[in-house]
């Protein structure tokens, strides 16, 4: 049993690509936690997609034994948190499970928007923060400038910042020593009733759900009956252990320690991140503060390209949901796309990760409909409906008003591109809240509708700033606006997968852009096809895709004009009939391209 004074719990805060996982690898390697022959890049990122995209999605943990310079043995528990904005709730929970953070900043690039967001999570959790300047082996490294920036932008003292190169291993020992010297030891009472925070959970096909816990008070032993405070479910603990990084069984976990338990739990949905775990008898009734069930923010439809793969898609979605409590799904049918699922996600990265995993791990080709957000529709009879799919919009004559979700977006951008960024935010109905400068970079804060950000805002931001801007957002609530549902009709048939909610003032421009794109993307048929954008019954934009023409008069030589006329009239009647009964095939890329906004 390690005394509390010799435990240090910490996390690493960094923007994507600033070297967080590499630093974690070096800390593990230099303390011989993992033998050199077992070492691999991004040791803690277990999903292939985490390694491939170079991001951390689930919180991972490792226990490191370190002998300090004063000769004493310390136990260091590292929780490697996700850095991306979609997983902000996971970050805030992981932060509450530890007492300190290493703030890793790339000394060639400086502070980025996600660094800021995660540092604020750390400050909210009352962390002691140790700044670490990484990548000092690169010629473009400028530690003084970046240290100054940390002080200006974040407001913490960076005079004692540790300079490291996670790649070469320089400065790693100083980092370990600094963790022991500067970060506080955890507090906790061994004799109090058990109070443990559920930091993360994932599904294992042999053990059921594995739960990552941080013990606040009391002791957790193998064989204990435990209870979750959020839903009062009880379970029997059949295994307890720690990660070194592989799972290692131990007998008990005491205050301040971070480890895992298994209790034959069948579904990840029963173990909610941030929940409080206690003993069934003589447990605590006071939950740890800050728990909230995760709510999906972005919705979209997932349909198999080949409709015979629907059952495989259902299996894959059910398996992914086992491991991801923030992912929700329900069955949906679409006239254009057949059977599929309407899924809810935390944000766009979360959507992409799930879609990539289905395509890669289960080999199913998918059609993704336009992402949409949750609108609040207030009816004239006083009822309020949550609208997840624009195709389900009730009749406008019954609707009193609509509210849409707004976000507070923080964008860090070099001065040279500021004008383009302001124009982009203005174009997306943004309201400027703040503009400050730190050195040669500007920090802009905008109030934006989530609907305008959800599809391709991030791509557009990256392209107008040549990839230099960084972006982070937080939800701020709902506001009324003049929104309407725009439908797209192809050959007079509405295509439900292309329905979108737009601001009334922008509907015409957006509709015109979409029908022009569809005209280029839909292949020509034997009959002419009108493509229209409509609000209610009013058509606001139209393009006509002309028919392919067969020369029916080719075999008439000279002679009588009435013969040609007769053949042409017959062709005309045939085309009219075809148009009435013909089915228009819309290719998959037409769905995605039509929804991408240019400009």
From Swiss-Prot:
GO terms for biological process: positive regulation of translation. Keywords: Cell inner membrane, Cell membrane, GTP-binding, Hydrolase, Membrane, Nucleotide-binding, Protein biosynthesis. PROSITE patterns: G_TR_1, G_TR_2. SMART domains: EFG_C (SM00838). InterPro entries: EF-4 (IPR006297), EFG_III/V (IPR035647), EFG_V-like (IPR000640), EFTu-like_2 (IPR004161), G_TR_CS (IPR031157), LepA_C_sf (IPR038363), LepA_CTD (IPR013842), LepA_IV (IPR035654). One of its GO terms (cellular component) is plasma membrane. Residues 5-187 form the tr-type G domain. It catalyses: GTP + H2O = GDP + phosphate + H(+). It is found in: Cell inner membrane. It comes from the Bacteria. CDD domains: EF4_II (cd03699), EF4_III (cd16260), LepA (cd01890), lepA_C (cd03709). Belongs to the TRAFAC class translation factor GTPase superfamily. Classic translation factor GTPase family. LepA subfamily. Required for accurate and efficient protein synthesis under certain stress conditions. May act as a fidelity factor of the translation reaction, by catalyzing a one-codon backward translocation of tRNAs on improperly translocated ribosomes. Back-translocation proceeds from a post-translocation (POST) complex to a pre-translocation (PRE) complex, thus giving elongation factor G a second chance to translocate the tRNAs correctly. Binds to ribosomes in a GTP-dependent manner. HAMAP family: LepA. This is Elongation factor 4. It comes from Roseobacter denitrificans (strain ATCC 33942 / OCh 114) (Erythrobacter sp. (strain OCh 114)). The lineage of its organism: Bacteria, Pseudomonadati, Pseudomonadota, Alphaproteobacteria, Rhodobacterales.
């Amino acid at each position: 049993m390690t005394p509390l004074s010799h435990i240090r719990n910490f996390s690493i805060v960094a923007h994507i690509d600033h070297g967080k996982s590499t630093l974690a690898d070096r800390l593990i390697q230099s303390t011989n936690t993992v033998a050199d022959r077992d070492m691999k890049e991004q040791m803690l990122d277990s999903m292939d997609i985490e390694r491939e995209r170079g991001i951390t999605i689930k919180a991972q943990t490792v226990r490191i034994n370190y002998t300090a310079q004063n000769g004493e043995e310390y136990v260091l528990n590292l929780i490697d948190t996700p850095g991306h904005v979609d997983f902000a709730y996971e970050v805030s929970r992981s932060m509450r499970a530890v007492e300190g953070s290493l703030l890793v900043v790339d000394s060639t690039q400086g502070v980025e928007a996600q660094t800021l967001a995660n540092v604020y999570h750390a400050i909210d959790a009352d962390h002691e923060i140790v700044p670490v300047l990484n990548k000092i082996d690169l010629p473009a490294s400028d530690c003084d400038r970046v240290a100054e920036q940390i002080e200006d932008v974040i407001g913490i003292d960076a005079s004692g910042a540790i300079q490291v190169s996670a790649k070469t291993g320089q400065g790693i020992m100083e980092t370990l020593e600094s963790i022991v010297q500067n970060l506080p030891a955890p507090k906790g009472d061994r004799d109090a009733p058990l109070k443990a925070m559920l930091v993360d959970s994932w599904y294992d096909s042999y053990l059921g759900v594995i739960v990552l816990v941080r013990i606040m008070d009391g002791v957790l032993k193998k064989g204990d009956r435990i209870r979750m405070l959020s839903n009062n479910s009880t379970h029997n603990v059949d295994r307890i252990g720690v990660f070194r990084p592989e799972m290692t069984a131990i007998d008990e976990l005491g205050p301040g320690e971070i480890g895992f338990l298994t209790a034959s739990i069948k579904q990840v949905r029963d173990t909610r991140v941030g929940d409080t775990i206690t003993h069934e008898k003589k447990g605590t009734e006071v939950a740890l503060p800050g728990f909230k069930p995760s709510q999906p923010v972005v919705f979209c439809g997932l349909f198999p390209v080949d409709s015979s793969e629907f059952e495989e898609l259902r299996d894959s979605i059910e398996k992914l949901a086992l491991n991801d409590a923030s992912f929700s799904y329900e069955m949906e049918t679409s006239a254009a796309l057949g059977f599929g699922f309407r899924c809810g996600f935390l944000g766009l990265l979360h959507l992409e990760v799930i879609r990539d995993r289905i395509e890669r791990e289960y080999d199913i080709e998918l059609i993704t409909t336009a992402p949409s957000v949750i609108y609040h529709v207030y009816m004239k009879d006083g009822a309020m409906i949550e609208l997840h799919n624009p195709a389900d919009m009730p009749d406008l004559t019954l609707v009193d008003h609509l509210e849409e979700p707004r976000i507070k977006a923080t964008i860090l951008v070099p001065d040279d591109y500021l004008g383009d960024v302001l124009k982009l935010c203005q174009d997306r109905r943004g309201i400027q809240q703040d503009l400050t400068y730190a050195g040669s970079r500007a920090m802009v804060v905008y109030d934006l509708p989530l609907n305008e950000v959800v599809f391709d805002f991030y791509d557009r931001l990256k392209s107008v700033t040549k990839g230099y801007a960084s972006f982070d957002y937080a939800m701020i609530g709902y506001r009324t606006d003049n929104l309407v549902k725009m439908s797209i009709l192809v050959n007079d048939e509405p295509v439900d997968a292309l329905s979108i909610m737009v601001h009334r003032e922008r509907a015409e421009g957006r509709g015109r852009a979409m029908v022009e794109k569809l005209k280029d993307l839909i292949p020509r048929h034997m009959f002419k096809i009108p493509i229209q954008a409509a609000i209610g019954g009013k058509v606001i934009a139209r393009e006509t895709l002309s028919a392919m023409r067969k020369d029916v008069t080719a075999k008439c030589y000279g002679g009588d004009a009435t013969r040609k006329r007769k053949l042409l009239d017959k062709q005309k009647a045939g085309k009219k009939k075809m148009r009435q009964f013909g089915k228009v095939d819309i290719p998959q890329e037409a769905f995605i391209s039509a929804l991408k906004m240019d400009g």
